[in-house]
């Protein structure tokens, strides 16, 4: 397996699972966490390693260290492994997804942004979903027909129990306290704004070619997806909130190993489902428009990344993230995109506009 994003939450869990099944790791790539990368190199002995910045190359305990986006593409070309787990955060993961598709590799995709910004250019790719909701949908949809609607669930994020008027005052520390999941900073903020759920709906659309998709808040994160059929029946996928289950579905050839303790239905608390309030989560207003106009993805994602990192760096408030997205959409409208190069151009233009 080739693992990009090895020092993040998904990468660390994937390596625990790889060790469980003795899956060889041929390549590791990370951003700046060189100390953890060196531990992983010592444990898994990859043939190839890549890091984001050449200034850290001398710190890496490996004799084949590649650098940046070019380094990732070189690894994909040279390494013969057929499986890439792409757990790079954000738009930065797109080039690796495109290259892996070009090379015919199986792509265990944690980098949902690839589909959010360039789903129409990734048709035919061999995707294995890593998000818990999409792994759940894959299970629910297998061999099924006459589907009326799909649902994925959201926890509501760190501020689910907050009043709208209190969101003006929240800190980065507050926003990073996810009630159910242990994840990286970027996705934890995206969960708090509901941008993550918006992106997951678009991801599901591209993965399963189905537009009747919605999301509901299920605060305990025990139900991950539901499938409603035309005859009125519905099915649901239950599991505890742990990413290792979805990762194992993507990287294991056989699902014959206990990964999590099963949900004990006799002890399970009462479950409640709630619609997502667009007053509290204004980003979610974009769901229907986004499904009609998937080209909006590159604008929404770039603006979201600018807004989130401004917030994480204490340059702006939590509510400014949504304002950043709507400002960019007002400026650019629906982009006409006919080539992958234009996706990169609009990403650049959006970031430049918001920083000017």
UniProtKB/Swiss-Prot annotation:
Mind telling me which SUPFAM superfamilies this protein's record contains? 1-deoxy-D-xylulose-5-phosphate reductoisomerase, C-terminal domain (SSF69055), Glyceraldehyde-3-phosphate dehydrogenase-like, C-terminal domain (SSF55347), NAD(P)-binding Rossmann-fold domains (SSF51735)
The prosthetic group or cofactor this protein requires is: Mg(2+); Mn(2+)
**A Pfam family in this protein?**
DXP_reductoisom
Pathway in which this enzyme or protein is active: Isoprenoid biosynthesis; isopentenyl diphosphate biosynthesis via DXP pathway; isopentenyl diphosphate from 1-deoxy-D-xylulose 5-phosphate: step 1/6
Q: Which reaction does it catalyse?
A: 2-C-methyl-D-erythritol 4-phosphate + NADP(+) = 1-deoxy-D-xylulose 5-phosphate + NADPH + H(+)
Broadest EC class?
Answer: oxidoreductase
- Disulfide bridges in this chain: none
Q: Which residues take part in binding 1-deoxy-D-xylulose 5-phosphate?
A: 112, 132-133, 155, 178, 191, 196-197, 200
Q: Which InterPro entries match?
A: DXP_reductoisomerase (IPR003821), DXP_reductoisomerase_C (IPR013644), DXP_reductoisomerase_N (IPR013512), DXPR_C (IPR026877), DXPR_C_sf (IPR036169), NAD(P)-bd_dom_sf (IPR036291)
Question: Where does the source fall among the domains of life?
Answer: Bacteria
EC number, UniProt record = 1.1.1.267
Q: Which GO terms describe its molecular function?
A: 1-deoxy-D-xylulose-5-phosphate reductoisomerase activity; manganese ion binding; NADPH binding
What is the purpose of this protein?
Catalyzes the NADPH-dependent rearrangement and reduction of 1-deoxy-D-xylulose-5-phosphate (DXP) to 2-C-methyl-D-erythritol 4-phosphate (MEP).
**Similarity field:** Belongs to the DXR family.
Name the UniProt record assigns to this protein: 1-deoxy-D-xylulose 5-phosphate reductoisomerase
Q: Which gene encodes it?
A: dxr
């Amino acid at each position: 397996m080739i693992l990009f994003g090895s020092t993040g939450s998904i990468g660390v869990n994937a390596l625990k699972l790889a060790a469980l099944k003795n899956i060889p790791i041929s390549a590791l790539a990370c951003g700046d966490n060189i100390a953890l990368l060196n531990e992983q190199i010592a444990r898994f002995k990859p043939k190839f390693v890549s890091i984001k910045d050449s200034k850290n190359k001398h710190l890496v305990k490996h004799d084949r260290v590649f650098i940046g986006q070019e380094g990732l593409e070189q690894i994909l070309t040279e390494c013969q492994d057929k499986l890439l787990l792409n757990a790079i955060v954000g738009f930065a993961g797109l080039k690796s997804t495109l290259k892996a598709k070009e090379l015919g590799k199986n792509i265990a995709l944690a980098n949902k942004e690839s589909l959010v910004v360039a789903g129409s250019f990734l048709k035919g790719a061999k995707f294995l979903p890593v998000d818990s909701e999409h792994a759940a949908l894959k299970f629910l949809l297998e061999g099924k027909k006459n589907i009326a609607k799909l649902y994925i669930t959201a926890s509501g994020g760190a501020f689910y129990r907050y009043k709208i008027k209190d969101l003006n005052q929240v800190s980065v520390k507050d926003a990073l306290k996810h009630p159910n999941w242990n994840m990286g900073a970027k996705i934890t903020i995206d969960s708090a704004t509901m941008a993550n759920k918006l992106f997951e709906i678009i991801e599901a659309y591209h993965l399963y070619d189905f537009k009747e998709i919605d999301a509901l808040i299920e605060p305990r994160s025990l139900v991950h997806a539901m499938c409603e059929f035309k005859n009125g029946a519905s099915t649901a996928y239950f599991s505890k909130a742990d990413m290792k289950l979805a990762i194992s579905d993507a990287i294991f050839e056989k699902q014959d190993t206990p990964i999590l303790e099963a949900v004990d239905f006799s002890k399970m608390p009462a479950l409640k489902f709630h619609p997502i309030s667009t007053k509290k989560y204004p980003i979610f207003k974009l769901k229907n428009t986004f499904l009609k106009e998937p080209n909006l993805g590159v604008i929404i994602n770039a603006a979201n990344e600018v807004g989130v990192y401004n917030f994480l760096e204490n340059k702006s408030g939590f509510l400014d993230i949504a304002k950043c997205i709507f400002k960019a959409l007002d400026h650019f409208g629906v982009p006409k995109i006919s080539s992958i190069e234009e996706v990169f151009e609009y990403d650049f233009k959006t970031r430049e506009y918001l920083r000017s």
